[in-house]
A protein has these predicted regions:
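Positively charged n-region of N-terminal signal peptides that target proteins for export
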Residues: 18-24
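Conserved HGGG/HGGXW glycine-rich cap/lid loop of the alpha/beta-hydrolase fold
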Residues: 70-113
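Catalytic histidine-centered segment of alpha/beta-hydrolase-like enzymes
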Residues: 302-310
Length: 324
């Protein structure tokens, strides 16, 4: 069965306002948007193994070592995973991206081979953003394309807002802008119900309920699932849940007090519409919090892990957008 995605492009109209368009002019900035609007979600081929994916290394972020896998040469692209996940979530995107870029897929602190400091305060957004900054500096670069999924998306949003000079472009997968999520938590009963898992993760003792096998249940590829179980066995369950304890909004949910700084670089968002944890209503009005172009690609039939559910489409979308 062939499914179709729809690309919406929000661009600055030259007056400081944003307008939304659904088509593009061939040969112009947005020539590829029309192609994406009818691009089928194709069946995915075999994924590279961990060993085939790239070269492993470590960057120092304060007292914490951050593990990464890198391949390719060119401008730097930093890939940031979410929960429960690790760098290998990008295995289907890394080969194509590395043809034009140096791709660095990092393990966030607490996960897999990165250090796992103790204490909720060690997982503040400031610390997580600092890890991305350290990775970019480790490769001798002043800026990078920053790509994030789930919690990696939250870190990427925050990095772009606090380090605009280091953010070339921003790619976000299945993670609304923080203002959009907070608005939905405050006003949308369905989002409140669907966020019960996050409230449970914030409770004392929640980590004792987790197992590596349980965290890997969503992985459909048997070979990859084995890798995931091993990665989660190396991880800190307390560290994983500290992302929620340190950064996820708590009840009573309220509207954002401050919208924060606007993102100053172009943004690509890709969102699988079957995601029940992060409902698509939170995507509304994202353009209000950006200074430049927003391209939003929604993917029917794809779940929360859109980079794996619709790997071919996500890869081609990212490559086309980054090469424009």
């Amino acid at each position: 069965m062939v499914e179709f995605s729809l690309a919406w492009v929000a661009c600055n109209d030259g007056t400081g306002r944003m307008k939304t368009v659904g088509i593009a002019v061939w040969g112009g900035w947005w020539w590829w948007a029309m192609f994406l609007a009818v691009a089928p979600v194709l069946a995915d081929g075999p994924a590279p193994t961990e060993a085939e994916s790239g070269t492993s290394g470590f960057a120092q972020s304060g007292e914490v070592k951050i593990h990464y896998v890198t391949r390719g040469q060119g401008p730097l692209v930093v890939l940031i995973h979410g929960f429960p996940d690790y760098w290998y979530t990008w295995r289907r995107q890394m080969p194509a991206l590395s043809e034009s870029f140096q791709v660095v897929a990092m393990d966030q602190r607490g996960f897999n081979r990165s250090d796992q400091p103790e204490g909720v305060e060690q997982y503040s957004m400031e610390k997580l953003v600092g890890d991305v900054r350290a990775v970019i500096r480790h490769f001798g670069q002043d800026k990078a394309v920053v790509v994030g999924h789930d919690w990696g998306g939250a870190v990427a949003w925050s990095f772009a807002m606090t380090h605009p000079e280091m953010t070339d472009r921003l790619v976000i997968l299945n993670l609304p802008h923080p203002n959009g999520l907070q608005r939905e938590l405050a006003t949308n009963p369905e989002q409140q119900r669907n966020s019960a898992y996050a409230r449970n993760f914030q409770k004392p003792g929640a980590a004792s309920q987790l197992t590596a096998e349980g965290l890997a249940r969503w992985v459909t590829d048997p070979a990859a699932r084995t890798n995931y179980v091993e990665a989660f066995q190396r991880s800190s369950f307390e560290g994983m849940l500290n992302f929620y304890k340190a950064n996820y909004p708590r009840e009573p949910y309220t509207l954002p007090v401050s919208e924060g700084p606007k993102v100053k670089c172009p943004v690509l968002m890709i969102h699988g519409l079957n995601d029940r944890a992060l409902l698509p209503g939170a995507l509304n009005d994202t353009w209000k919090w950006l200074e430049k172009d927003l391209t939003l690609v929604t993917v029917p039939g794809a779940d929360h892990w859109v980079q794996q559910d619709a790997a071919d489409l996500v890869t081609r979308t990212m490559v086309a957008w980054l090469r424009r």
